[in-house]
A protein has these predicted regions:
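Bacterial N-terminal signal peptides that target proteins for export
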Residues: 2-19
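Bacterial N-terminal signal peptides
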Residues: 17-28
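Noncatalytic luminal/extracellular "stalk/propeptide" segments of secretory-pathway proteins
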Residues: 35-37, 57, 61-195
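N-terminal capping segment at the start of a domain
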Residues: 36-70, 96, 106, 234-244, ...
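Soluble metallo-hydrolase cores and metallopeptidase-like ectodomains found primarily
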Residues: 36-38, 127-152, 236, 241-320, ...
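Second-shell loop/turn segments in exported
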Residues: 39-46, 61-71, 137-145, 151-153, ...
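Metal-dependent peptidase/peptidase-like ectodomains
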Residues: 116-118, 132, 137, 146, ...
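Active-site-adjacent substrate-binding region
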Residues: 197-208, 213-216, 220-221, 226, ...
Length: 520
């Protein structure tokens, strides 16, 4: 008879209940030699002498965003290596591929007719630069035409124009604002209109015979001087900033308020004109790196505990909560471990991954390049979903994860764990962040999942993902939690089990893209 595994969900706020306490402490006797002083010292240092604010300032303000292939990404790699070495921790940059090098310059966009207004906007990543040229031209809206034949006939009209290719949002107020103040019938009416408008705009794009990726190229080939978009992030003042698809002319995102202004003026026949000047540099193929730091194990140096956080970011903001906070969490955790646990039983590594944003490429490459580490991984702890306290930890489909994670959590002070919800054995993550690269290879990688702090709308990939959004008390707590979990995993006399739960579909291990943005 095959053994089956029941999925166990519980909340660590229930730790006073005997049956849950027993679950977490069932194997704690194996830690008779665990040094409580190490945990006490980590808590004291992490609370009273934390370096997270200093690290955040140096990374987010001093270096800024870390787009893969940009000079700032390499600057951040080198900064992290130097910082680790200043703490007495061995560190290195490991090359795993190459990417299209690009350096962002300035973006100046102004409406000059029918009246003058400086507009809030920025070029998208990898947008072609304009050199020293400034373009002044009329703004037009992508028309709603019958079909692709009609669109081809219209295309010459785009010559010499800026073309708006995004839907104008019916409201700049996020839904939570409507829920708080609007009449219910007004809110429902707005949502229905927005749904219909979104479907109609999607159909408008489809009827051109192109899609969101190919339409900008068709327009630039027809002579458009620039492409204007708005990728609203459903909050006040936020846009998501991703990649340009044009090869010759700039693509910019203009904030909802200004995009709506231009759209309404164009729609009503006022023929608005804007002046645009954007600069950027193409740098050719540049090497891409993961930054790896290491505290060598003494008893089992060929077994590994890993901390994990992607280092790259989109560049509309400064990559503060995606994933500057994960980065400084793991750097601070390593600092704490080096200071109070300098001779771990197992080797403790940290991986700061490149090109997570384009598909977990840095961590996938590491998994491919280091099978000996993947095979002998005791546990990996990853943090990548914002600045909030860790509130969720799942077993990622490993049948016995509740046993060893339970043992390690038992030593974590209640102030750090009393709001964490556990899900055992859970389901294996197929993507989303770098722990999934290890899980797909059958290695025990776990996500330290955080409170939202409106992450999805206000900071995730947005122009407002900046230092001021970091909640440092929560980051400090996460750094101490990560350090203690790494300590306990290193000390555990037992090797963690990688037996997969029955009936769980395991994700496919995907290969890293090692040459990006250069072949299209």
């Amino acid at each position: 008879m095959k053994k089956t595994y029941q999925n166990i969900n519980f909340d660590l706020r229930q730790l006073t209940k005997p049956f849950v306490l027993g679950l977490l402490l069932c194997s704690s006797t194996t830690f008779a030699q665990t040094n409580k002083a190490v945990i006490d010292n980590i808590m004291s240092e992490g609370t009273n002498n934390s370096q997270v604010e200093k690290l955040a300032h140096e990374l987010l303000d001093g270096i800024g965003p870390r787009l893969v292939g940009s000079p700032q990404m390499k600057q951040a790699n080198d900064w992290a290596v130097a910082k680790y070495k200043s703490w007495g921790i061995a560190a290195r940059n490991e090359k795993w591929g190459e990417w299209r090098g690009w350096e962002r310059g300035i973006s100046h966009i102004d409406m000059v007719s029918p009246w003058v207004r400086s507009l809030e906007g920025t070029q998208l990543a990898w947008s072609p630069g304009m050199g020293k040229k400034t373009s002044v031209a009329e703004v037009i809206i992508l028309p709603d035409l019958a079909d692709s034949i009609a669109f081809q006939k219209w295309l010459p009209t785009a010559k010499g124009k800026f073309v708006m290719i995004s839907m104008a949002q019916p409201t700049g107020r996020p839904d939570y604002n409507w829920q708080e103040f609007a009449l219910k019938e007004s809110f429902e009416k707005m949502k229905a209109q927005r749904t219909a408008q979104t479907a109609a705009w999607r159909n408008r794009i489809a009827k051109t015979g192109f899609n969101a990726r190919t339409l900008p190229v068709a327009l630039e080939n027809a002579g458009a001087v620039g492409i204007i978009t708005n990728n609203w992030s459903a909050g006040f003042g936020v846009s998501k900033i991703f990649s340009a698809y044009t090869k010759k002319v700039p693509t910019v995102d203009i904030a909802l308020e200004d995009y709506g202004l231009l759209y309404r003026l164009a729609e009503s026949g006022k023929k608005p004109s804007i002046s645009m000047h954007t600069e950027s540099k193409e740098l050719g193929a540049v090497p891409t790196f993961n930054t790896i730091a290491e505290i060598k194990g003494t008893e089992k140096p060929d077994e590994y505990v890993m901390l994990s956080a992607h280092f790259d970011s989109w560049d509309g903001g400064t990559g503060a909560t995606d994933n500057g906070t994960g980065t400084i969490t793991m750097m601070e955790a390593m600092r704490l471990l080096k200071k109070y646990y300098p001779n771990p039983k197992r080797t403790i590594l940290v991986g700061h991954w490149g090109s997570e944003e384009q598909g977990l490429n840095g961590s996938r490459a590491f998994v491919e390049d280091h099978p000996e580490i993947v095979k002998n991984l005791q546990a990996l702890f990853n943090q990548d979903n914002g600045t909030g306290r860790v509130v969720n930890l799942a077993g990622q489909g490993f049948a016995n994860s509740k046993d060893y994670l339970g043992r390690w959590l038992a030593a974590v002070p209640d102030t750090l764990k009393n709001r964490i919800k556990l899900d055992f054995p859970g389901k294996p993550g197929a993507g989303g962040s770098d722990f999934a690269s290890f899980v797909a290879a059958g290695a025990p990688g776990f996500s330290l999942s955080s409170l939202s702090w409106s992450y999805g709308s206000y900071t995730w990939h947005t122009n407002r993902d900046t230092y001021d959004k970091v909640v440092f008390d929560d980051v400090k707590s996460n750094a101490m939690l990560a350090a203690i979990m790494a300590y306990m995993a290193s000390e555990d006399p037992e090797k963690s089990s990688t037996v997969k739960a029955e009936g769980v579909k395991w994700p496919v291990q995907n290969k890293a893209t090692r040459r990006g943005g250069l072949d299209n």
